[in-house]
Amino acid sequence: MMTYIVFILSTVFVVSFVSFSSKPSPIYGGFGLIVAGGTGCGIVLNFGGSFLGLMVFLIYLGGMLVVFGYTTAMATEPYPEAWTSNKAVLAMFITGVLAELLTACYILKEDEVEVVFKFNGAGDWVIYDTGDSGFFSEEAMGIAALYSYGTWLVVVTGWSLLIGVLVIMEVTRGN
């Protein structure tokens, strides 16, 4: 059951990015990013990263939602274009969705799904020692992995958010 939930969330995630990349109006582009952020957090939550999912949800959808609202207010159109108003955009959107479905069907045809990477050094994880036995805390492992193995991910995420804010400020600055 969890595999199907992750599959559905992944499909919604990719379709929302397809809708963002073929945005005819800033309103729908911001909506596509908001849906992508929410479903991405749902995927992270399904894999047990409740702290990371909550952190991304609060930072991304809390902070960037203000920027999306501001840019939408600055770039409102009396008659915004929808995906169906331009036939080329609609055709590209449908082509992207069909490509995603065909790729998903091809992947699901295989019998097993393999993990892309493996962690071999269990000594790097945070272990809580309670006398005779120790146990791993999922939250502490996630934070430790984020800042030890995923240092580049934190740097790229911070840099992307900074560049995104600067681009949005430049676009909405006007003449």
From Swiss-Prot:
Sorted UniProt keywords = Electron transport, Membrane, Mitochondrion, Mitochondrion inner membrane, NAD, Respiratory chain, Translocase, Transmembrane, Transmembrane helix, Transport, Ubiquinone
Q: Which domain of life is it from?
A: Eukaryota
Per the UniProt entry, the Enzyme Commission number(s) are: 7.1.1.2
Q: What is its main location?
A: mitochondrion
Q: Entry's InterPro entries?
A: ComplexI_Subunit6, NADH_UbQ/plastoQ_OxRdtase_su6, Nuo/plastoQ_OxRdtase_6_NuoJ
Q: Which GO terms describe its cellular component?
A: mitochondrial inner membrane; mitochondrion
**Gene Ontology molecular function terms on file:** NADH dehydrogenase (ubiquinone) activity
Localization recorded for this chain is: Mitochondrion inner membrane
Q: According to its UniProt record, which protein family does this protein belong to?
A: Belongs to the complex I subunit 6 family.
Q: What is the stated purpose of this protein?
A: Core subunit of the mitochondrial membrane respiratory chain NADH dehydrogenase (Complex I) which catalyzes electron transfer from NADH through the respiratory chain, using ubiquinone as an electron acceptor. Essential for the catalytic activity and assembly of complex I.
Q: How does it assemble?
A: Core subunit of respiratory chain NADH dehydrogenase (Complex I) which is composed of 45 different subunits.
Q: What is this protein called?
A: NADH-ubiquinone oxidoreductase chain 6
- Its source organism is Felis catus (Cat)
